[in-house]
């Protein structure tokens, strides 16, 4: 009964000061909502384990290389076999290929299918379950012409085949027949397989790794230069992650000595799978957490100041009610009820704000969160919100209530006709203002530094013109385009078609690769240096482009000549190299006319041009902007750049 009476009294009191009530509610809602949103994101990314069994002991296996020792690079299939033979720290190691795509050719129009090529134990390492059929077995990973098999994801199966029973059915990818042996459970997500994918893309199907060479030609049982694999390893029980990482690194050291022409300068790096998937979010999240805490403190100070000012206005009212017989406990209960009511409304608004913010962030493709990370309102978020509300109640309800109810009545009545506040309230208000300004100043400085960093990121000089530029990706992983001359003719026809579109200034086809093989990174040795000496091996990224591509992209050609139509796959290999590449190959010398030999190749490459540095297909954090560019050898994955007027 007293509670209902206190609630009615609080509603009447707050109704007389709607501006005060709205301001307090909005301030609290924003403070609590912002903090709960940030901590919910941190919980989903940092605190919560990946949705895989024993995920804390799953390690991502990759290779580090000069200029990027922290790992993330690929290794070859022969290196994978060496890892299996020398492994002492993992009870299971699986390999998988970089993200790729094939075309489902059973319908009237081809359908893109995102593929992960994996070894047989890959899916079981991730705890995958099937809703129908089975997972891969060892005998499924065949390098011969045996009948190929495939496992479909639940989402892809529902999207393309509805509720049809697919087990045992034959589908065609790139006109190659595959027998469906399994369909994964609806909840399974292959986050490692999505590492090299575009934002929002998920794996649609899994194919045994042995079939990759037949379908893509990108992997070989014997070529140590064909670095296109990553690995997953489960650390043995009783062994620390640090010990497993050190043991894996030692394998890389031994291979570097055993194969100096292909593996020298490379390291093996093992990190937790979680770090590889979401480690890039850790630093920004800690910055956000710090900023949100400051925001909450500022909100607390604002609300405390509002409550103190409100209490000063009500001193005479409280004094009169106390003189009429209202006890101190009753006044405290009423004041607490008012504050609890304000906090309750603010908590509801904060929960709505958090729900909306998490949904918006979850659907924001540029955030590029792994598919195993789910931003959603759950019991942990609600617990965080309740905890923040509890702290707020203690700060804004109890202390002001005690202050207001224990006021000296004679002082209150004596001061009621004079402007100003009591000395105690004045000192408290000044302290709150000082703390609020201090916190705001720190937050302002941090925001300024963040904006400065953001501005630096948005003004990075990529070395080519990015204004009025459209890009698209073509994937020619199809038997129809498995011959290089067919791909070359296709790109020639594509350029003619696109150049005829209104507004298109030019069309640039940019593809990775040495002739006949797709690769982003190539080790090469300058002429006159011994290739078996690791110190002579220079790493460079290599691309295949059409004649005129440099000028079309705004990359200055400093010396030498551009490519011509005669620089095709039948002509001697020539290259235009960047300034950084020239400095690495021949410090202080003119590179024109000089030659270099890519490791694992027979044909020398002659330098015919020197171009300015540019960042193409490279990580922004990499300091090495060297790019080797060679004609011919267009791989199945092409980037198309369309400058427009």
Model-predicted regions and their roles:
Residues 31, 290-300, 391-395, 441, ...:
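Hydrophobic transmembrane alpha-helices
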Residues 66-71, 111-114, 234, 278-280, ...:
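Acyl-group handling in specialized metabolite and lipid biosynthesis
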Residues 17-45, 298-300, 344-348, 429-453:
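Short, strongly hydrophobic transmembrane alpha-helices
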């Amino acid at each position: 009964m007293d509670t209902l009476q206190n609630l009615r009294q609080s509603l009447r009191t707050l109704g007389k000061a709607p501006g005060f009530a709205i301001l307090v509610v909005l301030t609290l809602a924003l403070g609590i909502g912002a903090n709960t949103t940030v901590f919910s994101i941190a919980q989903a990314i940092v605190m919560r384990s990946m949705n895989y069994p024993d995920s804390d002991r799953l390690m991502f296996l990759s290779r580090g290389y000069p200029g990027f020792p922290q790992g993330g690079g690929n290794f070859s299939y022969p290196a994978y076999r060496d890892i299996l033979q020398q492994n002492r720290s993992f009870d299971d190691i699986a390999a998988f290929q970089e993200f790729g795509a094939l075309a489902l050719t059973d319908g009237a129009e081809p359908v893109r299918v995102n593929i992960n090529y994996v070894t047989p134990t890959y899916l079981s390492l991730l705890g995958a379950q099937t809703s129908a059929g089975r997972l891969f077995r060892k005998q499924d990973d065949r390098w011969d012409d045996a009948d190929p098999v495939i496992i479909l994801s639940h989402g892809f199966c529902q999207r393309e085949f509805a509720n049809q029973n697919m087990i045992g059915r034959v589908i065609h990818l790139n006109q190659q027949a595959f027998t469906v042996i399994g369909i994964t459970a609806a909840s399974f997500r292959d986050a490692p397989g999505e590492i090299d994918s575009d934002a929002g893309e998920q794996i649609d199907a899994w194919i045994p790794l042995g079939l990759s060479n037949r379908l893509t030609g990108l992997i070989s049982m014997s070529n140590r230069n064909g670095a296109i694999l990553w690995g997953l390893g489960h650390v043995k029980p009783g062994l620390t992650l640090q010990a497993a990482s050190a043991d894996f690194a030692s394998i890389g050291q031994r291979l570097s000595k055993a194969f100096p022409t292909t593996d020298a300068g490379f390291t093996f790096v093992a990190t937790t799978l979680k770090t590889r998937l979401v480690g890039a979010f850790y630093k920004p999240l800690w910055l956000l957490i710090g900023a949100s805490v400051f925001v909450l403190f500022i909100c607390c100070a604002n609300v405390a100041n509002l409550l103190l000012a409100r209490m000063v206005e009500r001193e005479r009212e409280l004094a009169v009610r106390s003189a009429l017989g209202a006890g101190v406990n009753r006044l405290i209960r009423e004041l607490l009820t008012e504050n609890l009511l304000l906090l309750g409304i603010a908590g509801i608004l904060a929960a709505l704000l958090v729900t909306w913010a998490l949904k918006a962030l979850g659907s924001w493709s540029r955030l590029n969160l792994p598919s195993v990370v789910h931003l959603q309102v759950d019991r942990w978020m609600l617990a965080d919100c309740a905890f923040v509300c509890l702290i707020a109640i203690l700060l804004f309800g109890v202390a002001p209530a005690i202050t207001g109810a224990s006021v000296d009545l004679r002082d209150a009545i004596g001061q009621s006709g004079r402007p100003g506040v009591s000395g105690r309230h004045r000192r408290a208000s000044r302290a709150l203002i000082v703390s609020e300004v201090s916190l705001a100043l720190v937050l302002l400085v941090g925001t300024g530094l963040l904006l400065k960093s953001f501005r630096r990121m948005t003004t990075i000089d990529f070395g080519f013109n990015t204004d009025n530029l459209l890009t698209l990706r073509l994937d020619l992983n199809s038997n129809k385009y498995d011959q290089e001359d067919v791909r070359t003719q296709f790109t020639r026809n594509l350029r003619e078609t696109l150049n005829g579109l209104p507004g298109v200034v030019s069309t640039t086809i940019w593809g990775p690769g040495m002739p006949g093989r797709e690769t982003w990174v190539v080790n090469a040795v300058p002429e006159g240096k011994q290739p078996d000496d690791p110190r002579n091996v220079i790493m460079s990224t290599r691309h295949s482009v059409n004649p005129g591509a440099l000028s079309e992209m705004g990359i200055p050609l400093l010396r030498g000549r551009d490519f011509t139509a005669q620089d095709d796959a039948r002509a001697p290999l020539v290259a235009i190299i960047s300034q950084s590449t020239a400095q690495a190959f021949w410090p202080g010398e003119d590179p024109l006319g000089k030659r270099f030999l890519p490791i694992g190749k027979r044909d020398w490459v002659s330098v015919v041009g020197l171009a300015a540095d540019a960042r193409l297909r490279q990580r922004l954090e990499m300091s090495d902007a060297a790019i080797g560019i060679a004609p011919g050898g267009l791989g199945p994955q092409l980037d198309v750049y369309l400058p427009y007027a």
